[in-house]
Amino acid sequence: MDYHWRGELGSWRLLLLLLLLAAWKVGSGQLHYSVPEEAKHGTFVGRIAQDLGLELAELVPRLFRVASKRHRDLLEVSLQNGILFVNSRIDREELCGRSAECSIHLEVIVDRPLQVFHVDVEVKDVNDNPPVFRVKDQKLFVSESRMPDSRFPLEGASDADVGANSVLTYRLSSHDYFMLDVNSKNDENKLVELVLRKSLDREDAPAHHLFLTATDGGKPELTGTVQLLVTVLDVNDNAPTFEQSEYEVRIFENADNGTTVIKLNASDPDEGANGAISYSFNSLVETMVIDHFSIDRNTGEIVIRGNLDFEQENLYKILIDATDKGHPPMAGHCTVLVRILDKNDNVPEIALTSLSLPVREDAQFGTVIALISVNDLDSGANGQVTCSLMPHVPFKLVSTFKNYYSLVLDSALDRERVSAYELVVTARDGGSPSLWATASLSVEVADVNDNAPAFAQPEYTVFVKENNPPGCHIFTVSARDADAQENALVSYSLVERRVGERSLSSYISVHTESGKVYALQPLDHEELELLQFQVSARDAGVPPLGSNVTLQVFVLDENDNAPALLEPRVGGTGGAASKLVPRSVGAGHVVAKVRAVDADSGYNAWLSYELQPAASSPRIPFRVGLYTGEISTTRVLDEADSPRHRLLVLVKDHGEPALTATATVLVSLVESGQAPKASSRQSAGVLGPEAALVDVNVYLIIAICAVSSLLVLTLLLYTALRCSALPTEGGCRAGKPTLVCSSAVGSWSYSQQQPQRVCSGEGPPKTDLMAFSPCLPPDLGSVDVGEEQDLNVDHGLKPRQPNPDWRYSASLRAGMHSSVHLEEAGILRAGPGGPDQQWPTVSSATPEPEAGEVSPPVGAGVNSNSWTFKYGPGNPKQSGPGELPDKFIIPGSPAIISIRQEPTNSQIDKSDFITFGKKEETKKKKKKKKGNKTQEKKEKGNSTTDNSDQ
């Protein structure tokens, strides 16, 4: 019963031990196998795939592979069945020497995901090596005087096997004088000695032959034999002796050459030469002992003569002979065991494997970049290695197993900020002082298309003169992409939209690669003042990224339109207009008025009127207003004046070069009583067509009055709707930007005749544009312009589309009065509440100024149907027409243009003003006021006749 219970207890203990062993294997993440040495090729070792939990089908797709640093070809894994087998002959003695433990360390690596498993294959020893003696014959010299029980050390045999296979037993052949004694302190250090049984007698037996046999503990047993030749010496019967038979010394491996290991002392009771002792290494010592140590023959001092290395050999067994000088000499023996102590003299080694480079900048955290293994040949704390990574990098080291690390991604990457990392891995051991080694690893960051092309500014302003040649280069856009390679290749394109009735691409094109913007056709300022569009920049990445930039192209005016006459019209007799003037009229009486318009703007549309001198009538009593075009008398007519005058009026703009038109007016002088009759005869005869035209003008004036009333009502309704309605997105529509010009005689505001278009892609039309004509007169004062600024347009104001009915027909434009007032019309406006320049209001009935007076610029391209509206309150401070404002303010721009010039005359000609926005008085109102005006003209004419230069 008791035996049965003990058996069950032993079984439980064995089962518990197996469970603990299995749990240790699982926790360590390492597989253990064993294989005997000298196994044949193909010998089964273990089902490694099954033990690792891997399916056979996934071995090839996951790139199942086995890696080993030194013994890669000894073992192999079949990818068909997942079995680890012997690939080539394994010799344990060659692999591990005399080490008690011998294992082959393997690394099993699989991808997707990357995993590393560690496998230890223990190589079991097989008794395949017999005991071996270093020499075939061992010679001994024994004095006959030696006492029984004298001992003579013998060189033992060595067995390359380990464990029980290397445990040796010795036996000596049968002999009367000698026996064998083995002193077994441990299995590694057995002292084999030949013991003298009884005293020798050289005369009886001068030599003895024995055989020493060594047998190992393997199954089956293997043996080795050496012959012992014992020579018996005579006379000197006392040998030197040591204090102890074995000495043990410990010394560090970094001890310098010449360092004393031990100083031996032997004694000999003999006297004289028989007592003189010399020390030497025994003839049986190994060569490596002689290479690393030396002994002084006289003193017995053992010193270091070569560099010691704990990693190569940590124990030296030195056999020392102390020999006297007798005849024959006698020797004493001892053994010195020198144990080498480890010193931290080996730098850790770093190995980088399984690099996954380059790394995409959008890689996830935890991505494995590389596998790192470290090793230190030292032992104990000197061989314990820790691995670290340089700070401030987006990577970290993760310990996966002893002396194995994974380099993983720890934070986000940005190639545009850092395109490559030079990592330094440091391995440091635990010695004192510690040693370290470094390894450099270059990690390149692969680009990902995560940056869109960017322009230097969101909007550009471009100025282009009209009538440009087709295909001319007007601007170049450039966008920069922070990415690399194809992700940074930028292509440009036009954001297509409609410009009125046509597509944008019919006006503008953009070069795909260079970003150059071309005008495909000549631009016309009178048709299109502002063209706003967008250019798109897109890279070649996947997916592509892009951005847009806005271009505002302002078309600058050129003097390409000559003045066009409205009145007098070409026709009648010889293309001239006929006027009848009573001889009784006084000075300043308006005889006729020449009306003309210019489709240009600015100075190019500023018209002036000149009366051409006639060769037949060098002294004519008429003059023409410089800016009004009114033909009036310069004095009271008398009988000496010619009854007929042919007046040539030259209409000229101020462009470079100036364009002109000529109007012819026939003036006939009649008596006051004969004027109605002459007029009737003229209407019935020669001037028949003019009479019909006069009747038409009457109807036109009536129609103008009606249309003017309707226009005022429409404007009021439009203003109310504009103030109450919310701003709407602007498109391409007819607009009339205010153009402010300056000259030597003042400043004026001008609105062009033709409906012009201001095209915008996203914002509202720009109504506050101020431009300056480049063709200023030479007498204009200096213009100081600040640094060139881009024209910034306020997008806050988004006026509604004007009523398309707010147009004049051709017949109405022909008959409208050309005198418009500048009353309450702002000349310079930079926005609501900004500077507002006003001019006095004068009527067309105001008499002509005296000679030498300077009139303000009027008629600058403004016809009779031009209207100018005032925004915001007027400035109570009014400058004279001959004065210039100190500064011109360009709305939406910090540029300020200063123009200052003293007027040429303190007096101001008020009769040459053109008033904007005023309707022409009807003939009925003129007739009612004619009497008063005639009286005023006579009074003023009498005072100005002497000063007139016409």
UniProtKB/Swiss-Prot annotation:
Record's compositionally biased regions (Basic and acidic residues): 909-923
Membrane topology summary: Single-pass type I membrane protein
Region (Disordered): 830-950
Span list, region 5 X 4 AA repeats of P-X-X-P: 774-894
Domain named Cadherin: residues: 30-133, 157-242, 243-350, 351-455, 456-565, 581-678
Gene3D superfamilies the record matches: Cadherins
GO molecular function terms noted in the UniProt entry: calcium ion binding
Extracellular compartment spans: 30-697
PXXP-type repeats, residues: 774-777, 799-802, 832-835, 873-876, 891-894
TM annotation in the entry: 698-718
Topology Cytoplasmic: residue spans: 719-950
Main location: membrane
Subcellular location: Cell membrane
Signal peptide start-end: 1-29
Positions annotated with a glycan in the UniProt record: N257, N265, N548
GO annotation, cellular component aspect: plasma membrane
An individual GO BP term: nervous system development
Keyword vocabulary terms for this entry: Calcium, Cell adhesion, Cell membrane, Glycoprotein, Membrane, Repeat, Signal, Transmembrane, Transmembrane helix
Function statement: Potential calcium-dependent cell-adhesion protein. May be involved in the establishment and maintenance of specific neuronal connections in the brain.
PANTHER family attached to this UniProt entry: CADHERIN-87A (PTHR24028), PROTOCADHERIN ALPHA-6-RELATED (PTHR24028:SF305)
Protein name: Protocadherin alpha-8
